[in-house]
Regions:
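N-terminal secretory signal peptides and thylakoid transit peptides that target proteins
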Residues: 1-17
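Gly/Ser-rich catalytic/binding loops embedded in alpha/beta enzyme cores
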Residues: 14, 23, 33-218, 321-325, ...
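A short helix-breaking turn/cap at a secondary-structure junction
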Residues: 28-39, 43, 109, 230-323, ...
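Glycine-rich, small-residue loops and helix-cap segments
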Residues: 60, 115, 155, 159-161, ...
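Acyltransferase
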Residues: 64-69, 98, 287-291, 314-338, ...
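Residue-level signal for inorganic ion chemistry
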Residues: 71, 93, 263, 301, ...
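Short helix-loop capping/hinge segments that flank enzyme active sites or metal/cofactor-binding pockets
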Residues: 113-133, 290-305, 351-405, 417-421, ...
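Short glycine/serine-rich loop segments
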Residues: 145-274, 453-474
Length: 508
């Protein structure tokens, strides 16, 4: 596999860039949130938090239709530059927003996301709205039913406006594909947004949406969260059930937003038991709408040292470690300590390969020229490994979970970097070296994220500051098994203490 894009994908990427026209200036590391004479009334609405927007709609100080039109206007102005939202259904959205306002006028019960616009990751099925999965095989695919997460989001009152960009079949952490091209980072338009929920994270960062859904196997909620200075939350396995029948603790859907409070609000709409999924958790999801503020005094924090010897770019560790004092100032007890990650290098890829083989092996056999090399590699590796390899991986996964329970008997949370590198050039598919160390495959450079996946715990990416080059860095906070609420409280306290997440690209 090459470290550059395939000719087909690269041509598509460059083509997408060509139609954007002149590029606006990007935000420097010291630029505050959007402000000044160029700020329009629409921009003021789109910069509000999801929680505040929802409250204003309930108070009838603004309507769902007004909120929708503000976001559509901003999408029209900004999205051609960043390519975050790849399918837009404005007329359908207007009809849904009108119906939402009419329900409110009749005094009907309103869901927690009432009137909030949202675009769904282009991996999940949306009835009547094109769902491409970033693949030419599905470029004209229009599902007839909604995925479970979309059903729950709509039932909670949100207004679907379209789909967000993703790599082909969600493989990789550079959001580009042959259908729509690449998504660009608002802080530096020559850099990637990460992936695979890159379109969603970019849309949030650029105030195109107040909330967005994503999914995560090896970091796909957390990596783009870090690189777009927003919050990406990977919930506990089973917290947000899926209807694909896989029941794997490796992959989960989850919420993304510009604040921890908004993530918690969103989680309250998509969490909850789903009878056909035996792994789904039964906790009342409305509990995630409680106030997050709480004292962190006495909380014991395990602080990252090297995650078992992983290489990190110096700016990643510098920015993260600069936040250690913030936890101490919050009253936490911070000490160097890490889980035992031995054996994860073999076990996680083994189980990951199986998921790709199950989903795409037959399609690849029938359409080999329409699959990118990294997906083909996943399928080939699954066919190379044997039953003993899978059994060992499953055993290591069970062993890891027992170890994690012992680890968190002493600590309330573990803090480590989300990524090992800063956002890289958009014309690079994946880094082949990190801090001088070779990365043989396209997933090796993301071990800091998928090591945490293997812990089977909730994990959140929260803005941690900016590198010397002006690019965002995320802090990854990992909570106890099924301790999603306590983790959100800690992340909220850190967010309030630092305010790193206030910075946004300054598109005039």
């Amino acid at each position: 596999m090459s470290d550059s894009l395939s000719r087909r994908a690269f041509t598509q990427l460059v083509g997408a860039a060509a139609v954007t026209g002149a590029l606006p200036r990007a935000l420097s590391a010291n630029t505050p949130a959007m402000s000044g004479p160029d700020l329009t009334p629409d921009d003021e609405l789109t910069s509000l938090s999801a929680t505040e927007l929802a409250a204003r709609i309930r108070r009838k100080s603004v309507s769902a239709r007004e909120v929708l039109e503000a976001h559509l206007a901003r999408i029209e102005r900004v999205n051609p530059t960043v390519n975050a939202i790849v399918t837009l259904v404005p007329e359908q959205a207007r009809a849904w927003a009108k119906a939402a306002d009419e329900r409110q006028a009749r005094g009907e019960p309103l869901g927690p996301l009432h009137g909030l616009p949202i675009a769904h990751k282009d991996l999940v099925d949306t009835a009547g709205i094109r769902t491409t999965k970033g693949s030419l095989l599905y470029k004209d695919n229009v599902p007839t039913t909604d995925a479970l997460i979309v059903q729950r989001i709509r039932a909670a009152g949100a207004i679907t406006i379209g789909k967000t960009n993703t790599p082909e079949f969600g493989a990789g952490s550079n959001t580009f594909n042959a259908v729509f091209g690449a998504t660009r980072n608002g802080f530096n338009l020559q850099k990637t947004v990460g992936g695979s929920s890159g379109g969603a994270a970019c849309a949030l960062n650029c105030n195109l949406l107040p909330i967005a859904d994503g999914s995560d196997t090896g970091g796909s909620l957390r990596n783009p969260g870090a690189w777009n200075n927003i919050v990406g939350f990977r919930p506990s396995p089973g917290r947000v059930p899926d209807d694909d029948g896989s029941w794997s603790p490796l992959s989960t859907s989850g919420p993304m937003a510009r604040s921890v409070e908004d993530v918690a609000l969103f989680l309250s709409a998509i969490a909850g038991v789903h009878a056909p999924d035996p792994t789904s958790l039964t906790d009342d999801p409305s509990l995630f709408r409680r106030p997050l503020a709480a004292s962190m005094k006495g909380k014991r924090i395990a602080w990252f040292t090297s995650m078992g010897g992983l290489p990190f770019e110096p700016e990643i560790t510098r920015v993260l470690n600069a936040n250690r004092q913030a936890f101490i100032d919050m009253g936490c007890i911070v000490e160097d300590a890490e889980p035992d990650f031995s054996g994860v290098d073999d076990a996680f890829p083994t189980l990951r390969h199986l998921t790709y083989h199950t989903s795409y092996a037959k399609l690849n056999r029938d359409n080999p020229t329409l699959f990118k090399d990294t997906v083909k590699w996943e399928i080939a590796e699954a066919e190379r490994q044997g039953a003993v390899d899978v059994a060992r991986a499953n055993a290591r996964q069970a062993q890891m979970y027992r170890h994690v329970q012992q680890f968190f008997a002493k600590y309330d949370a573990y803090v480590c970097p989300v990524t090992q590198v800063e956002p890289f050039d958009i014309t690079t598919e994946y880094p082949t070296r990190v801090a001088g160390v070779a990365m043989p495959t396209y997933i090796d450079w993301m071990r800091s994220a998928w090591y945490v996946t293997f812990m089977q715990c909730p994990a959140i990416s929260v803005p941690a500051g900016f590198s010397a080059s002006g690019l965002p860095v995320g802090a990854q906070i990992v909570g106890r098994p099924r301790g999603d609420w306590a983790l959100l409280q800690l992340a909220h306290a850190f967010e309030q203490a630092t305010a790193h997440g206030k910075r946004r690209p300054d598109f005039a």
